[in-house]
Amino acid sequence: IRDRRYTVLTENEDYYNSLSDSEKSSLEMYLKAAENFWQITVDHHTYVTGGNSQSEHFHAADKIGYDATKSEYDASTTCETCNTYNMLKLSKALYQVSGDKKYMDYFETTYTNAILSSQNPETGTTMYFQPMAPGYNKVFNRPFDEFWCCTGTGMENFSKLGDNIYTVSEDSVAVQMFYSSEPV
């Protein structure tokens, strides 16, 4: 993981694209890079909701509680929603390549806790950050004069509600997310 000059969103996209490159060229190093990034992020920079980051960056490993409550950064700027979205893209791609269920377990937990909770049910607007510190309220974008990166991915999140409930292979269908649904 690079130094703090790069946002987590940039990091995530690099590893997702590396994984796409590995599918084209069969270079194991790209797959290994994506797997390592995913594992480091989940093990050392992720909150219980599945979201991660502080002020769009990774800081010291295993210090997310400090980042959320006592750091010099604004405690309301944890868990950037579009970074969470990109971790879901990476998780799905890693699952498709490896078949390892841990990626879909993370996907289900994160989609349920971080993505579904990121939309205002009354207005449809979305959140940029999801504060993990106690005492913070949710802040949603204003519908007509405020547009963040997470506004765009926020719309995309809710256009994919049924995308990963099931995965299909040649000889089976697997339930990946236990939501009320019917396979089509």
Regions found by a protein language model. Give the residues of each.
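Glycan-recognition and catalytic cores of secretory/periplasmic carbohydrate-active enzymes
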Residues: 1-184
